[in-house]
């Protein structure tokens, strides 16, 4: 009987651990750049890339990858090794993004890197700020 209780408790703990890890925030969410200089908060073209795979707009999931004049709605996420392949529709202007007009299909490959780095389409990016460190209004 004691063995059954121990097995039951171990099983319950394993289930809770699996559920907790499956809800962990994606390592890709946040503000990234290819250099520390590009992490500065300034307007204009640079390598800053904002990734929010849990983004919600008007109560609906709306994951996005946002770069200077390149606003991408994530249509599909496919696991690939230690990363993801994102099938996206990208727009040059926010107005087009909001209207869903003049989009182009783009595939974006994300891969985890060493501490606070990722690779976006093979290029190394460093973490500027985690998503929860950024202002809510973007």
What do these predicted regions represent?
Residues 1-9:
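Bacterial N-terminal signal peptides that target proteins for export
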Residues 14-22:
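C-terminal segment of classical bacterial N-terminal signal peptides
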Residues 23-36, 80-86:
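Conserved long hydrophobic alpha-helices within structured protein cores
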Residues 38-42, 71-73, 89-91, 127-129:
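Sequence contexts marking disulfide-bonded cysteines in secreted/extracellular proteins
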Residues 60-113:
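Contiguous, well-ordered beta-strand patches that form the walls/edges
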Residues 65, 118-119:
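Short aromatic-centered micro-motifs
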Residues 119-138:
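Edge beta-strand at a domain terminus
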């Amino acid at each position: 009987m004691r063995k059954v209780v121990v097995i039951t408790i171990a099983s319950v703990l394993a289930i809770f651990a699996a559920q907790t890890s499956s809800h962990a925030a994606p390592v890709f969410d946040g503000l990234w750049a290819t250099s520390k200089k590009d992490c500065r908060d300034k307007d204009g073209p640079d390598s800053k890339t904002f990734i929010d795979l849990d983004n919600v707009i008007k109560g609906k999931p709306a994951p996005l990858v946002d770069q200077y004049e390149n606003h991408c709605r994530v249509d599909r996420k496919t696991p690939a090794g230690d990363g993801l392949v994102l099938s996206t529709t990208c727009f040059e202007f926010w107005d087009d993004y909001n209207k869903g007009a003049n989009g182009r299909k783009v595939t974006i490959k994300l891969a985890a890197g060493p501490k606070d780095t990722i690779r976006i389409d093979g290029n190394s990016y460093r973490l500027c700020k985690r998503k929860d460190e950024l202002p809510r209004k973007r």
